[in-house]
Amino acid sequence: MRFLISSLLSGLALLTSLHAFVLALPREYSISMSNPFHESLFSCPAASWPRVKLGSENTPQEPSKDLRKILSQISPKRIETTIRKLVSFGTRHTLSTQTNATYGIGAAREWIESEFQRYANASDGRLTVKVVGYDQQADGNRIPFPVRISDVVATLKGEGDPERVYVVSGHYDSRNSDPLDYKGIAPGANDDASGVAVSLELARVMSQRDLPRPKATIVFAAVAGEEQGLYGANFLAQSFRNSSTNVEGMFTNDIIGSSTADDGTKEPHVIRLFAQGIPPLNVENQAMRERRIMIGGDNDTPARQLARFVKETAENKHTDMEVSVIYRLDRYLRGGDHRPFLEAGYPAARFTEPNGNYAHQHQDIRIDKDPKTGKDIQYGDLPEFCDFDFISRVGKVNAAALWNLAMSPGMPRNVRVNTTALSNDSKFSWDPPAGGNALVGGYEIVWRSTTAPFWTHKMDVGMVQEATIDLSKDNVVFGIRARGKNGERGVAVLPFP
């Protein structure tokens, strides 16, 4: 008993000493006694090092008047109508009939084309529509017999830099539990009528005659063959590559239909954006890859720079969404149509809902037991499980990103940092974007700490193609971006030695 009392008194004395120590700390080291292991105990004034008084804070870019108008016109009701119409075709399996007027993927394709064409007819020639495709032979996997793969493509041609292209897509094919069942019902409301609905809605709104034309070209696509092996997207990406098209960004919207997880958790104001790290070897060879890793550039690939741009321009009160950038190609065991674009050498990223509910993806329509709870639940990718307001907000995120991309200058080329001599400053050089300097109002150097995910600082260096900054290249990550004549920011590019 005496030992217990002695131990308690010793412990009390220790806590009293700790409290006195905390009270004596300078303000910058202060911690809360309700949380004595507060993180500031392990921090110090040097935590923000390197401390520099250069440039300014890199704040989010506010949407322009034209963009605010676009965002205000994206309609949840139209999106719902599109999804229900696509579901009405019974199945949109890539192998399903292409000759039936009301059932199967052929009927769905013709309806999508007619909708794009309807918007084109109202656009005063701004929007053009075509169906492109090829005959895919049996692949010994999910294509057991030859089939026509068709993509529906609507193009809003830019005015100023029309050779620079941005692509947004959703896949209109669907499947149920059996990836080879091309006769059974496969509604595909979320996967991926939701993504197609966004492509259609953005084409409708952005092609209106009372809006200015974008500077760059925007392509709105509905592709097939995704569930069977990303065939339609691969065909589209390779078509762009074979024609040397300058695609500076691609987004796929795949499974963006629900804000509710399988446990009922709701995240109605969050969208995930998956962005790949190290590019495929066919895009950057081994020597280039080793060089990127050597300079710590594995987190500054074109796809991740594109994702940073989305975060900076599309996360605001007008979209009412948080863009959760995931530094990963895709979810585990899943794939998407951004991958063929990445493999073709284009920056690309995938939007997808915050939490998956696998009872409503790739499932036969049925009532069955929930393996977790044992209760009967409805299986199947049905419209009743879609959140149309959520989809419209995802559409707004896409619209904000695409419009800002298409109205800003393209990416600077041949961006370099001088490493010929040891120094504590950083000297950069670059060439204008592929479209030249016609849309450029100046250039900015941006930077962040090596552990920060997004740009934190910027410095406007004017209409130049080289600049030196009094901040060591060893201590931060730099990027160079073009700025439009009205302040529109472009995508930053990592400088290589």
UniProtKB/Swiss-Prot annotation:
Q: Name one Pfam family in it.
A: Peptidase_M28
Q: Which cofactor does it need?
A: Zn(2+)
Documented EC number(s): 3.4.-.-
PROSITE patterns, from UniProt? FN3
Q: Where does Zn(2+) 1 bind?
A: H171, D191, D254
Q: Which InterPro entries match?
A: FN3_dom (IPR003961), FN3_sf (IPR036116), Ig-like_fold (IPR013783), M28_fam (IPR045175), Peptidase_M28 (IPR007484)
Q: What is its main location?
A: secreted
Task: Give the top-rank taxon of the lineage listed in the UniProt record for this protein.
Answer: Eukaryota
One of its GO biological process terms is: proteolysis
Keywords noted in UniProt: Glycoprotein, Hydrolase, Metal-binding, Metalloprotease, Protease, Secreted, Signal, Zinc
Which region is the signal sequence? Answer: 1-24
Q: Which GO terms describe its cellular component?
A: extracellular region
Coiled coil residues, start to end: none
Chain positions recorded as Zn(2+) 2 binding sites:
D191, E227
List where in the cell it is found.
Answer: Secreted
Gene3D superfamilies attached to this UniProt entry: Immunoglobulins, Zn peptidases
Q: What family is reported? A: Belongs to the peptidase M28 family. M28B subfamily.
Task: Give the protein's recorded name.
Answer: Probable zinc metalloprotease ARB_04732
Organism per entry: Arthroderma benhamiae (strain ATCC MYA-4681 / CBS 112371) (Trichophyton mentagrophytes)
